[in-house]
Amino acid sequence: MGGRIALFVTFFGTLIAIIWGGFVGIFCGLVGGRVDDIVMRIIDAFLAIPWILAMLLIVVILGTSTQVLIPALGFFYGKGIVRVARAATHDVIARDFIMAAKARGHSNFSIIWNELFPNVRDAIMVEGAMRWSWMLLAFSSLSFLGFGVSPPTPDWGLMISEGRGLMSFAYWSVIAPIVALSSLIIGINLSADALAKALGIDRTQKAPV
């Protein structure tokens, strides 16, 4: 039961991150120039803000409902996907089929949807899977600190927080949710690594600045 709300929030948060991060990254990689520079400097500025401070500010002002947590997590974890999508776009932007699409007068949206997205989709999905695991840890951390879901909603982070006072005689009340959360995060990470290897994606490659 403890993982249901965490999976719900982080799954849809990851979808939001993939959608907006992927589109912005591909668009910046395609148009380049001043637009690319401005957007990436904005992304860099947001990346410099500690996510925990920003999330705490958001939940204090707007509350801890899923309608707040899902888009907030999706925004903060989409910034990294922007860089990955942009780097993947740079790898294919000079290929002949992109040049041909530009020569035929296709719009940027048409090139993104029909030419670029099918070629960078795999990299975005692998990065999204990794962000999902990090988002699970972030969501559980918020619940542990009392800024996530509220009782009686079952959540692993909340269970760990409430079980701390029972460690002396009921240690399993803390160990069980820790093991469950750790197993899920490790499983998602291993699945993402396996997917990257199957698709031939090098996750160690640096994104261009």
Region roles according to the model:
Residues 59-62, 66, 75-76, 122, ...:
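C-terminal transmembrane helix and the adjacent membrane-cytosol boundary/short C-terminal tail
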Residues 1-8, 36-47, 63, 117, ...:
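Alpha-helical membrane-interface segments at transmembrane helix boundaries
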